[in-house]
């Protein structure tokens, strides 16, 4: 069973994020959604709690999403904690 972490700012969650999760669900059995702490980042629109709640609402019925995390640490350490061997990344532009 392949588990992956998708760590992103989610400020706000966009259709691009949804597309990445949908595409990734074809490759991974389980996906952990992680919003990263970007406190103090210029232009921040939502608090960490609000961003995590948005992710939960957007991905609520997605069959591959197994957990939601808010992280202050590195994504690599989260992968170790949740026993994920893969990280999902998006590319802009």
For the regions a protein language model found, what residue spans apply to each?
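Nucleotidyltransferase catalytic core that binds NTPs
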Residues: 1-93
